[in-house]
Amino acid sequence: MEKFQSYLGLDRSHYFLYPLIFQEYIYVLAHDHGLNGSILLENAGYDNKSSLLIVKRLIIRMYQQNHLILSVNDSKQTPFWGHNKNFYSQVMSEVSSTIMEIPLSLRLISSLERKGVVKSDNLRSIHSIFSFLEDNFSHLNYVLDILIPYPAHLEILVQALRYWIKDASSLHLLRFFLYECHNRDSLITSNSKKACSSFSKRNHRLFCFLYTSYLCEYESGFLFLRNQSSHLRSTSSGALIERIYFYGKIEHLAEVFAGAFQANFWLFKDSFMHYVRYQGKSILASKGTFLLMNKWKYYFVNFWKSSFYLWSHPGGIYINQLSNHSLDFLGYRSSVRLKPSMVRGQMLENTFLIDNAIKKFDSLVPIMPLVGSLAKSKFCNALGHPIGKAIWTDLSDSDIIERFGRIYRKLSHYHSGSSKKKGLYRVKYILRLSCARTLARKHKSTVRAFLKRFGSQLLEEFFTEEEQVFPLTFPRVSSISRRLSRRRIWYLDIVCINDLVNHE
């Protein structure tokens, strides 16, 4: 991104982004850095040569229009989009998100260099969250389960960008584009939630950018108040700031919130507080009392109401005691348990035993939701009995085995941090027998006759990487190999969650 800074001249233009939408190279940049690929190349009927002509035609059409706002009120006749309204709309969605990401990406790079933060991809790993929880949650008492309210109005998403994008023309264009898409979706369905879901699917990159900016706006205020109310810096703030893209916002909030909350900081003093966000939800854990957590609960409700005009009922935030509560998120069921231990001591001629219980953060595989996901994907029925995958019978035998094996290896790889892996044996059984039933159905045979004919060696693809590596590493010490294969392993290369794991 640095090589585009001098070419775009953003420093000299004070982040005036609106003229960039008329430049052809911006569309090339959107194509090269697209998260979901380029709509220019995915659109049927357009090849690589004609895609540049489409861009030029779109730019010329935007130059010729001077009544963009009027087209919003007329849903049946929109001269700006023309006949290919949906296609041009998706092109503008990709380009708009790319343009608005440029100054924020440059701000992130400069902030990292100024703070001396070494950017690491390991911070993006999902498993890094669990390793952090293991180190910090075992000595905490209470946890807030927070459902982050969804912005009910598109204007809230636009307002979240005002502090970062100073170009009013770009914000007006974004506002016009959002209302144009929203009005079109509202004509299709009267349900606002379905209309918003339709918009997020068709404009995934732009929607993710706007939703992330909204979350960062909310978290910046919370992070400022949390750091001001504590004598010790939160150990999670480094990873939190690395995940979100805005730093200067904290300096602005210092001026806004200093007068409003200065007299109430003593209410929130807590040196042991940690925050984790995932899938539109968040967790706030603390060593404080129930009264302190209840104050934080109502702070969040009032903060969303005053800053984002969002009405959130206090019932959407739950206060739970960690010793009696399990956290179900990201495919794991985590809890703080007391691990009993016994210490044998001796004083002179007297020997005595001391019982000592140690708090330990434990993560397990919730097997029933995982079996439910397999049943939803037609690998088994609701009771967990394996069934064949009929739609895969047209594939070759090797492709069928490779698909089933890849699914199990990914599940085993993701759940390698579980302290008890017995639940994965049931998943392995379901997938192996489902694979055998699929192959038997393809060859018009029974499972017993098929396995007797080809042998069980046909399903060796179901061995995981750990099952293959450990016997090679310790070929003579089988007990060490089995013990290591049962140990918890967190991988820092997992940056996305599997659909079968995501039970939310």
From Swiss-Prot:
InterPro entries: Domain_X (IPR024937), Maturase_MatK (IPR002866), Maturase_MatK_N (IPR024942). Signal peptide: none annotated. Belongs to the intron maturase 2 family. MatK subfamily. Its main location: plastid. The lineage of its organism: Eukaryota, Viridiplantae, Streptophyta, Embryophyta, Tracheophyta. This is Maturase K. Keywords: Chloroplast, mRNA processing, Plastid, RNA-binding, tRNA processing. GO terms for molecular function: RNA binding. GO terms for biological process: mRNA processing; RNA splicing; tRNA processing. HAMAP family: MatK (MF_01390). One of its GO terms (cellular component) is chloroplast. Pfam families: Intron_maturas2, MatK_N. It is found in: Plastid, Chloroplast. The gene is matK. Usually encoded in the trnK tRNA gene intron. Probably assists in splicing its own and other chloroplast group II introns.
